[in-house]
Amino acid sequence: MFDFSKVVDRHGTWCTQWDYVADRFGTADLLPFTISDMDFATAPCIIEALNQRLMHGVFGYSRWKNDEFLAAIAHWFSTQHYTAIDSQTVVYGPSVIYMVSELIRQWSETGEGVVIHTPAYDAFYKAIEGNQRTVMPVALEKQADGWFCDMGKLEAVLAKPECKIMLLCSPQNPTGKVWTCDELEIMADLCERHGVRVISDEIHMDMVWGEQPHIPWSNVARGDWALLTSGSKSFNIPALTGAYGIIENSSSRDAYLSALKGRDGLSSPSVLALTAHIAAYQQGAPWLDALRIYLKDNLTYIADKMNAAFPELNWQIPQSTYLAWLDLRPLNIDDNALQKALIEQEKVAIMPGYTYGEEGRGFVRLNAGCPRSKLEKGVAGLINAIRAVR
């Protein structure tokens, strides 16, 4: 019904992954598996809705607080995550990272600390340090059956007086960990006990395929908190901009909206972003179901090929995200030598693990959100590069 094997040429579309790969990797003639967007066209229902809106021809100022947008969000949380939300607590933002940054500014002072689980999405470091706050890392531990947080170590950090916020990535990027209900309950209890506010970035919430379902932070939340997300990852529409969140505390919500509108002048959203989200959340579930099957098969392909080439890896697909977080430490290869071989010999761009913090050394992050034909070339290039530097 949906053909994810179709190759779409993204060159010349001002595309970060393809047109600007040289910015990060130094050369343009690379096959990229980098930034976390996909090479697939978005859902047909979204394209149809956008076409209809474009035919209207008038693109004046718009407002996010409308019944259709709020109802679509409520419908999605109800049908996909079995969670009821109060539409009065929903807020808009131009991006999840903008919302993260704004709440960091509001909920902490210069020099105070923000807890993150590491390895961590690189934009988290930038949002924290760019606001003159201090990163307080808590390293996830890799075990035979997945990634885990030592809750004792987490509490030791949360208990420090300078710690004001826990910035949670749920599901976690780059490891693909899906937090269990017990883990979320423990973290909620610890944050409440130590007066730490919680910002939960749940932008990958729809990309889950393991036995553990995604559980929204709102299901366990206590105290002051915000759940931030978007349809941009799920439906491959980040260039349309637009995100949303849930802030239950009315004072915190009002303060956020005041900054969004008054100080930053960002409260009028892209009407195409609204149109796309409404179509996605009301009609896009069948497309997303098919996409998840394709992406899981892609990740399984990576596991089969990498484990056949290097049995000592025994790599298992992640619980979530289309990002293969590959632990190459058993191969004892040099990160920089591998990157050099990937770029110069294989002409492939794959994110080095140290992009996501010191705990990422020895890993690479390979974006599997692409047609299989492209993925085959990337995995072959990675295998060849590893063999060249061993």
From Swiss-Prot:
Keyword Transcription regulation: yes
Taxonomy, superkingdom: Bacteria
Keyword Transcription regulation: yes
Any Gene Ontology biological process: methionine biosynthetic process
Key words, A-Z: Amino-acid biosynthesis, Lyase, Methionine biosynthesis, Pyridoxal phosphate, Repressor, Transcription, Transcription regulation
UniProt-listed PANTHER family: PROTEIN MALY (PTHR43525:SF1)
The protein's name in its UniProt record: Protein MalY
Encoding gene per record: malY
